[in-house]
Amino acid sequence: ILRPTLPTGGHATMGKSLYVAAAKTCPGLSWTVLAAIGGIESDHGADTSVSSAGAEGPMQFEPATFAQYAVDGDGDGLARIDDPYDAVYTAARMLCSDGAGRGGAALTAALFAYNHAVWYPPEVLSLAARYAGS
């Protein structure tokens, strides 16, 4: 079950401030979209087990995809798939490169590129709307 509100806390917690900061790297991308992805993929870092497809970490990247877009989000000199800061900033970079900042159909296409499931874009957008309203 997805949390209706975002967690708060320190470095290991994926809270609103992290999503807001990462979204600012992609003009037009709402922090709520990143938060919705984090909520769907790992319940904001609560479940980071490796998926059956091999996706890992709080934003559930396949290692090759993470390597392609990797960002050192916390400035420690490393971009790690299991680090919440690195993973969220990397998600923002990937989404932005796929046109998410343009909104509308481009955002939907970027979300589908993030997770190739028909149900995924509407689920992300629905949860993002809930976060925007909270």
Roles of regions detected by a PLM:
Residues 1-134:
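Catalytic glycan-binding domains that act on GlcNAc-containing polysaccharides
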